[in-house]
Swiss-Prot record:
EC number, as in UniProt: 2.7.11.1, 3.6.4.-
Keyword Repeat attributed: yes
UniProt-listed NCBIfam families: circ_KaiC (TIGR02655), PRK09302.1 (NF006799)
Primary gene name: kaiC3
Name of this chain's protein: Circadian clock protein KaiC3
Coiled-coil zones: none
Domain-related comment: In the homohexamer the 2 domains (called CI and CII) self-associate to each form a 'donut' layer; the compactness and local conformation of the domains varies over the cell cycle and impacts function. CII has the autokinase and autophosphatase activities, both CI and CII have (weak) ATPase activity.
Post-translational modification: Autophosphorylates and dephosphorylates. Dephosphorylation of KaiC3 was higher at 25 than at 30 or 35 degrees Celsius.
Catalytic activity: L-seryl-[protein] + ATP = O-phospho-L-seryl-[protein] + ADP + H(+); L-threonyl-[protein] + ATP = O-phospho-L-threonyl-[protein] + ADP + H(+); ATP + H2O = ADP + phosphate + H(+)
Modified residue annotations for Phosphothreonine: T424
Subunit comment: Multimerizes, probably forming homohexamers, no interaction with KaiC1 or KaiC2 is seen. In another study forms hexamers, interacts with KaiB1, KaiB3, and KaiC1.
Amino acid sequence: MIDQETDGIEKLETGIPGFDFLSDGGLPLGRATLIAGTAGSAKTIFASQFLVEGIQRGENGVFVTFEEPPKALRKNMRGFGWDIQQWENEGKWVFVDASPQPGDRPIVSGEYDLGALIARIEHAVRKYKASRISLDSLGAIFSHLSDSAQVRSDLFRLASALRELGVTAIMTAERVEEYGEISRYGVEEFVADNVVIVRNVLADEKRRRTIEILKYRGTDHQKGEFPFTIINKKGIVIIPLSAIELEQKSSDIRITSGSEELDRMCGSGFFRDSIILVSGATGTGKTLMVTEFMDGGVANGERCLVFAFEESREQLIRNATGWGVDFKQMEKEGKLKVVCRYPETTNLENHLIMMKDIIQEFKPNRVAVDSLSALERVSTLKSFREFIIGLTSFIKQQEIGGLFTSTTPNLLGGASITDAHISTITDSIILLRYVEMYGEMRRGITVLKMRGSMHDKDIREFSIDHQGMHIGKPFRNVTGILAGTPMYTAQSEVERLSGLFDEKI
């Protein structure tokens, strides 16, 4: 058992990813915690995972079920890789089955024998030397009581019995609404020492799961709602954004962008641990920049990883081949890994966990994401910004160079790089733009931002052929390129304006 003491309160690590950070060390030892949520908010998974993590730490557990029979729970939890039947055989997990049995007549007020239930719980805890217990769900045993005072009295009696046993308990309770009354009867939260709310909110036709520690008697905890997700073979994974600290080291080492001309524009290349955002309209060359970024890394003996959310693997390989880059050979040599997923396959939290896992497993020196816009369209702005913060902070902690692409909504110009304003999070910004001149469509590139370094301020013309990107000379005597309204300015006017600035200086 791993205990921790905070503010005089001993704590038990739950082992649920992210929760022990939010709770400043885990659940208060020997106390009861209420997990409240609407149907489908993951209360039962939380209660089960609490016992699973305990077993993996050598702590036996008791699961008291009031709704689902043990057989159904065993089957439902098998998808997470939890073999409850085996743990039962080993005496590590025991059910106290208080669920309705076929043929049972409905309970009427005053008939439920709480004393008998408490006796069964006490017997199971003592026999199996359990230190953790989960009760799911309280509403099932108190639904026959119409008097809230009686509900409170019975709850207090149950909580007192658990406290006497010295076990750390999880009790789940049903909520009617995501925001409003904490519990169905309005008294459960007053009996429990701690209250945690899990939500599954529908916003903009998308589901978003969050967890909030509402009450933690006698000890500190993180405030507010935090996103979480449910993953096969893992269970609940909480993403505590407040755990992100700006303590990572900053490197002065430069890495190549894959283009000599762009390296010169950036003052000898990117910093090794920087996050670069490449923004431009469709077809301006963003994926080409990703390809050259990967090619430059592999040429220097670096391991490179690409997450593609718009194109299939075959398309990426074909496009790279067309620019003279052999992705297949790089993969054979183990220097490159290409991961292609459609954004719609899952939510952003799942994508983030998946990307973190792959980064930790492959251990790349460079990571590219093409494109953020594909992920932005399947999420809310809040979820998207949290995703970006979570991903960029993780990449920086690993001291990895990252290149993200973003598609601007306008073909010419653009008022904002993204609706989520992620430009403040990135270290460098490169803009790619179409430039319409004399009935011809050209391309322009500029380094808008390069944190900690001098860089070229010009907007330069570039072309694309079978050898990739070629950056040329600056656009001269042309204004309004970034706004999407390029206008030719006579040389005499340029000289006059330059003279005005010289006079002021």
